[in-house]
Amino acid sequence: MEEMLRQKIEDAADPLRTALLYARAGNYIDFGAMNEVNENTFLSLLDSVPFRPEDEPVMESFFKACEKAERFLLITDNCGEIVLDKLFLEQLKKRYPALQLQVLVRGQEVLNDAIEEDASYTGMDQLAEILSNGLPLAGTVYERLPEKAREAMDRADVILAKGQGNYETLSHQGRHIFYSFLCKCELFTERFRVLPLTGVFAEENG
């Protein structure tokens, strides 16, 4: 399936934008939040995730930030979706070859979140430096991060955090962070006033 998805991305009019949307759709692969993860549902979501009009300026802001950036940090969520995250990083590196890529994963197994072993298994370590948050926590708590992970967050010109857990633990703390996730629980569908499995791109400017 990875090669099929890569080809669909390559064939798209804008491969980077498509890869970013696919990576967001990959947030569906969450055995911690979903009662059932269905392959057909996932494949249908790739090209049909409900798109909020307010996401468009966020995406434009994201791409403009990447154009000027030297360091990019991706904070991952579920292990199942990091193959799509890797495909996104491939396109990001093609568009901005000088961009230094880092990926922050969970430090220990928690729910079905990605750890260093998962990132290496997918080959993501061939594209980016893989960092551990040192914690078995379904989110990212800056104050509890090891020094190298804190330094990566402090030095990154662009941060993209995936998933609801990262949004809950990182938002409203005065940092400039882009967020990408599907709304999979009532808390998020009510907060963003959307239907279940609606995709969200959000930006906090600090």
Predicted segments with their positions:
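C-terminal functional extensions of proteins
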Residues: 105-107, 117-206
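Histidine-anchored nucleotide/phosphate-binding helix
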Residues: 78-97, 102
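Structural motif
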Residues: 71-73, 157-158
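Residues at the starts of beta-strands that form the adenosine-phosphate
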Residues: 70-71, 98-102, 176
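Electropositive, gly/pro-rich neighborhoods at or near active sites that engage anionic ligands
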Residues: 1-69
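Short, hydrophobic/aromatic alpha-helical segments in well-folded domains
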Residues: 61-65, 75, 88-91, 148, ...
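Conserved catalytic alpha/beta core of Sir2/sirtuin-type deacylases, generalized to analogous enzyme cores
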Residues: 29-54, 68-71, 108-116, 121-127, ...
